[in-house]
């Protein structure tokens, strides 16, 4: 029986996940930029974040986040609200359109994966299902 090189397997898994994530991001954008899509998801994960909070979360410079946020507000995806306690701070909320866009992004990602899975043989579809179960277990253990 051949001995598995776990280091090489881990590196291959990391590369495959990175490539899959990149493909999912590009397949799901619709009419918004990757930075806008990422910011929408960051806003959704946080309660009433400030632009500074988003700059940290997105690992971006504050002026870049401000510029993207202004574009997103103009598109109706978010609402910029002055902080009542600190007038220097601006808080960010998702608009109804922003929530719809997040749902559309997720739907497009799922459709992309579903299309890929449907192109596989039945045997490979079962292997993919087993792989998902494995990844879920792996993440639960972390």
Q: How would you name each of these model-derived features?
A:
Residues 17, 21, 102, 136-139:
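A structural signal for well-ordered alpha-helices, especially hydrophobic packing surfaces
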Residues 70-130:
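Charged, amphipathic alpha-helical coiled-coil/dimerization segments
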Residues 22-64, 69, 75:
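N-terminal helix-turn-helix DNA-binding core of bacterial DNA-binding proteins
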């Amino acid at each position: 029986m051949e001995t598995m090189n776990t280091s090489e397997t881990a590196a291959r898994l990391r590369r495959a996940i990175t490539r899959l994530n990149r493909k999912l991001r590009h397949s799901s954008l619709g009419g918004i930029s990757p930075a806008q899509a990422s910011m929408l998801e960051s806003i959704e994960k946080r309660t009433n974040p400030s632009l500074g909070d988003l700059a940290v979360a997105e690992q971006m410079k504050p002026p870049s986040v401000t510029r993207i946020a202004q574009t997103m507000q103009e598109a109706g995806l978010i609402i910029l609200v002055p902080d009542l306690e600190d007038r220097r701070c601006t808080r960010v909320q998702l608009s109804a359109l922003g929530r719809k866009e997040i749902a559309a992004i997720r739907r497009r990602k799922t459709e992309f994966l579903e299309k890929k899975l449907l192109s596989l043989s039945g045997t490979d579809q079962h292997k993919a299902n087993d792989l998902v179960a494995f990844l879920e277990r792996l993440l639960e253990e972390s």
